């Protein structure tokens, strides 16, 4: 079955991408599979300047998932452009950059740096970062700030599609989705991690140095599915689903509720070949459930009467 798809102007050979922060810059996973067998990769979050990230420990295993508080450790956008991007097969593999910033103006500046890079297919904007100018509340929890960030990035991004990555740590994710759409976003990706924590009762200490981290993995999949389903029915722009996908069947569930593409995140930590395996198995799963085509299957959920 042909599983190629157009996502917000991106020509994807299949709807399977990797999630930012779980696949490095792609180069680290080349030994486990053919990068060009994927629909695309989203590289780890990039900031204008290098970031060391949070102190250790940054990761804690939880039942059916994991908590992380990496703190967007990265070498900075210039290092990515000069040393990482040239090594990627970007002519045949869509490479999406994930943007991290502390205010809307900085997001716009970062988009401007990447706008002229032929090897970057699209910009994914992480609005789960704290807005330093507004008291530290995450952009993604304030619809007005989401619109402002989307506008700032869109203004400077040239012809690159803008994907706003939404946080589930809100009362109504559809309000945030509409805010991103109003700001000119070409697409959405969701969900980012759920806010959580873990403690050690023997030491009486948090298991993360940052105390609070982001929960991901199979535990969050029902929440992610609900968020994608609600969002698809609230906006006109396409949605990329992520959250707890570890099998081709999981990926198909997100497509069924209306996502046009999906991202594999924590599954890459469980087994480094996860994304490659899902990309290979998805056509077989769609054929097994008697889908006429990928387009026919997307959003074909039958609701109770």
UniProtKB/Swiss-Prot annotation:
Give cofactor(s), names only. Answer: FMN
The protein's Enzyme Commission number: 1.3.1.14
The note on the cofactor says:
Binds 1 FMN per subunit.
| Catalysed conversion reaction | (S)-dihydroorotate + NAD(+) = orotate + NADH + H(+)
Determine if NAD is one of this entry's keywords: yes
**Which catalytic residues are annotated?**
129
Residues the record lists as binding FMN: 20, 44-45, 98, 126, 165, 191, 217, 243-244, 265-266
InterPro entries this protein is in? Aldolase_TIM, DHO_dehydrogenase, DHOD_1B, Dihydroorotate_DH_1, Dihydroorotate_DH_1_2, Dihydroorotate_DH_cat, Dihydroorotate_DH_CS, Dihydroorotate_DH_I
Q: Kindly indicate whether the keyword RNA-binding belongs to this entry.
A: no
Its Gene Ontology cellular component terms are: cytoplasm
* Assembly and oligomerization: Heterotetramer of 2 PyrK and 2 PyrD type B subunits.
Protein name stated in the entry = Dihydroorotate dehydrogenase B (NAD(+)), catalytic subunit
**Source organism:** Maridesulfovibrio salexigens (strain ATCC 14822 / DSM 2638 / NCIMB 8403 / VKM B-1763) (Desulfovibrio salexigens)
Gene behind the chain: pyrD
């Amino acid at each position: 079955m042909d599983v190629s798809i157009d996502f917000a102007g991106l020509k994807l050979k299949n709807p399977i991408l990797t999630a930012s922060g779980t696949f490095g810059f792609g180069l680290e996973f080349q030994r486990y599979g053919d990068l060009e067998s994927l629909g695309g990769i989203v590289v780890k979050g990039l900031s204008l300047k290098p970031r060391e990230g949070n102190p250790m420990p940054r990761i804690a295993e939880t039942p059916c998932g994991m908590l992380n508080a990496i703190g967007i450790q990265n070498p900075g956008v210039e290092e990515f452009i000069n040393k990482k991007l040239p090594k990627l097969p970007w002519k045949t593999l869509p490479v999406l950059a994930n943007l991290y910033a502390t205010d809307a103006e900085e997001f716009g500046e970062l988009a401007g740096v990447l706008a002229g890079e032929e090897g970057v297919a699209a910009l994914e904007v992480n609005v789960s970062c704290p807005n330093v100018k507004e008291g530290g509340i995450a952009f993604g929890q304030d619809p007005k700030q989401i619109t402002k960030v989307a506008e700032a990035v869109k203004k400077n991004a040239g012809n690159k599609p803008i994907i706003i990555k939404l946080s589930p740590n809100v009362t109504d994710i559809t309000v945030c989705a509409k805010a991103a759409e109003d700001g000119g976003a070409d697409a959405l990706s969701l969900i980012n991690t759920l806010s959580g924590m873990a403690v050690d009762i023997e030491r009486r200490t948090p298991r993360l140095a940052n105390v609070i981290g982001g929960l991901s993995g199979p535990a969050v999949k029902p929440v992610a599915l609900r968020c994608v389903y609600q969002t698809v029915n609230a906006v006109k722009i396409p949605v990329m689903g992520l959250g707890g996908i570890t099998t081709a069947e999981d990926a198909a569930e997100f497509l069924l509720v209306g996502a046009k593409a999906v991202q594999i995140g924590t599954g890459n930590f469980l087994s480094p070949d996860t994304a490659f395996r899902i990309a290979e198995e998805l056509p077989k799963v769609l054929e097994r459930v008697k889908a006429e085509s990928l387009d026919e299957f997307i959003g074909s959920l039958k609701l109770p009467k």
